[in-house]
């Protein structure tokens, strides 16, 4: 869903961990990622200041996703960009969904909808062919 897409926009949510990211590939493929839990952009330094993290995220605008990885034990999501920077989205929370992703706007899925469920489970909804 995210491979070879470019990060093209962000809507800021009500708190420091709530953001909606938009991705696009060509003229016909859109995807979104709603983050509702902790996240950060990996870099060489270990500073995790909120303003700095948002700036790092914004700096990734228009970069292509080079690699996508889901964690083994929990659905931690890692999007690695062509620059080598990685956006890490936590996939575990005791009571709440950590993130959702789909391939249609607004916040839906034409073919895919993925949800990092409470307790670290991943729900995958796939359109069935008729």
Regions found by a protein language model. Name each.
Residues 1-130:
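Surface-exposed, interaction-prone regions used to assemble/regulate multi-protein complexes
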């Amino acid at each position: 869903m995210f491979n070879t897409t470019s990060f093209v926009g962000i809507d800021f949510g009500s708190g420091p961990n709530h953001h909606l990211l938009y991705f696009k590939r060509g003229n016909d493929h859109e995807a979104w990622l709603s983050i509702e839990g902790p996240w950060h952009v990996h870099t060489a330094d270990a500073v995790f200041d909120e303003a700095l993290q948002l700036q790092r995220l914004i700096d990734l605008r228009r970069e292509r996703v080079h690699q996508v990885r889901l964690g083994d034990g929990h659905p931690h999501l890692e999007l690695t960009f062509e620059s080598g920077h990685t956006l890490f989205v936590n996939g575990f929370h005791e009571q709440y969904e950590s993130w959702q992703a789909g391939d249609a706007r607004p916040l839906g899925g034409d073919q895919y909808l993925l949800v990092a469920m409470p307790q670290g489970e991943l729900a995958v909804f796939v359109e069935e062919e008729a």
